[in-house]
Amino acid sequence: SSAVLRGSIPVTDPAMLASDQSFEEVDGNKYMNSSAITWGAAGLAGVWAEENTRNSIYDAFRRKESFATSGPRMTVRFFAGYDLDTSKINDNDLVEYLYSNAKTMGADLDGIGKQIPSFFVWAVRDTFTAPLQRVQIIKGYVDENGNPQEQIFDVACSDGGVPNPNTYRCPENNAKVDISTCEFSRDIGAAELKTFWNDPTFKSEERAFYYVRALENPTCRWSTWDAVRNNVEPRSDMPK
């Protein structure tokens, strides 16, 4: 599908404009009335399999040791356990240690009294796109009134940043993207982010789930890329 058919650049072909196609007008330009303009980038799924075979990959799906991205080919690992040895964070046998002493992503971790679980997260950037900005852990739980809640924690920050202990947010790394060219900051951000983390709001009587979100520095949306490549202004009614 071309950028015109996706609705990301204006229709200029007289024959197409004279056809019975449905158009929408934005800033004096006519665009194809296409639902594609609201879609996100093609997503990808990744699994941690012992080997590149059908059986091994499906085994990884079954145990839910898997993750998804909105397009970038980054990789993410996530483990949970008790009394994990944080001094091993840079050891060569770190992953082997975690598989032996923790639960992998997608697994259930049973409570042990009032003991606070430890988490380990490791994200590695896609080398063909922007560096990493931060890694978050999102906690979901049911409060005392029976209402579902979610809380977001920044747990690892790029460029030496440390999460604020009160807001649980990383400082901004001031990465930029030039909407006119789609050039983005290449000298800010991290190639990888990894950390051990404990939930500061943990309650032993509370059932909860945790998942990881790795964020890149800002980049252009696909529709903005279409506009830049075709030397036209991006649509004003769409995110950039």
Task: Pin down the residues of each PLM region.
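C-terminal functional module detector
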Residues: S1-K240
